[in-house]
């Protein structure tokens, strides 16, 4: 969003040189405010970030918030989601709705969403078969795009190390995503399951938004092993599904 300066009629009557100087001065001032807000978020000072955001919005300086949100997403900051969450629960829902991409609002409002793996355009689902531990293997669905099988909901907690954590239960089975405790010795990957309980860090996840081409995408990281992000396996079964959701070590 571009910064727009609105002048009163008496100001418009002055020379063009003075008008340009005033605009440049105000733009410079706003740039300093942007840096202050960005740094507050980056250092995890969310209370200050929320206060600043509410103040700027009340002063008609929403472009500051918009620019900061854009920069956070472009930079792939992990603190973006917690800043959004703090606004959402801190009288700033209108700011989230106005300046954050639409998918942030869906997540914060606790709506059911689809988790789509961009490379293969497959939606995350749980398999129909229960193992002896009453858990289901997670898959990338090769056909389904609109059923309860691929609907997930986020529940937010304020986590450690300034992270927003999520336990996403699926609508169809009401199970949570769980990271396996077993690591493949060759690939260092772990399988993802659906489980009935969410009482350990292996069922807690957080989102890291990023900008890719013209899309806003999210890496999904597990809390227990924070360098691990979700990915789909390479093997495709007869149904067109990818053989389970695995995790890749992100360096």
From Swiss-Prot:
Signal peptide: 1-16
Cited Pfam families: Lipoprotein_11 (PF03260)
Top-level taxonomic group: Eukaryota
Heme keyword on record: no
Alphabetical keyword list: Lipoprotein, Secreted, Signal
GO terms for cellular component: extracellular region
InterPro entries, per database record: Lipoprotein_11, Lipoprotein_11_N
Localization annotation: Secreted
Family designation: Belongs to the 30 kDa lipoprotein family.
Miscellaneous comment: This lipoprotein belongs to the group of structurally related '30 kDa proteins' that comprise major protein components of the fifth (and last) instar larvae and of pupae.
Protein name, UniProt field: Low molecular mass lipoprotein PBMHPC-21
Organism in which the protein naturally occurs: Bombyx mori (Silk moth)
């Amino acid at each position: 969003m571009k910064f727009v300066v609105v002048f009163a009629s008496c100001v418009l009557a002055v020379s063009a040189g003075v008008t340009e100087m005033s605009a440049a001065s105000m733009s410079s001032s706003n740039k300093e405010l942007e840096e202050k807000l960005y740094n507050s978020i980056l250092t995890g000072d969310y209370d200050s970030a929320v206060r600043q955001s509410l103040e700027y919005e009340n002063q008609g300086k929403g472009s500051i918030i918009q620019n900061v949100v854009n920069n956070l997403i472009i930079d792939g900051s992990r603190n973006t989601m917690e800043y959004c969450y703090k606004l959402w629960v801190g009288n700033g829902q209108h700011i989230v709705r106005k300046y954050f991409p639409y998918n942030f609002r869906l997540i914060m409002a606790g709506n059911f969403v689809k988790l789509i793996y961009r490379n293969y355009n497959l939606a995350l689902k749980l398999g129909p078969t229960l193992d002896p531990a009453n858990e289901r293997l997670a898959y990338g669905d090769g056909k389904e795009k609109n059923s309860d099988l691929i609907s997930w909901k986020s529940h937010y907690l304020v986590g450690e190390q300034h992270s927003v954590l999520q336990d996403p239960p699926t609508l169809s089975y009401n199970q949570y995503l769980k990271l396996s405790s077993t690591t493949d010795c060759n690939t260092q990957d772990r399988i993802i399951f659906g489980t009935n309980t969410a009482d350990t860090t292996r069922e807690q996840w957080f989102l890291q938004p990023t900008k890719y081409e013209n899309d806003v995408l999210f890496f999904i990281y597990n809390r227990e092993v924070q360098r691990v992000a979700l990915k789909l396996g390479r093997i495709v079964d007869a149904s067109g599904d990818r053989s389970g959701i695995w995790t890749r070590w992100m360096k």
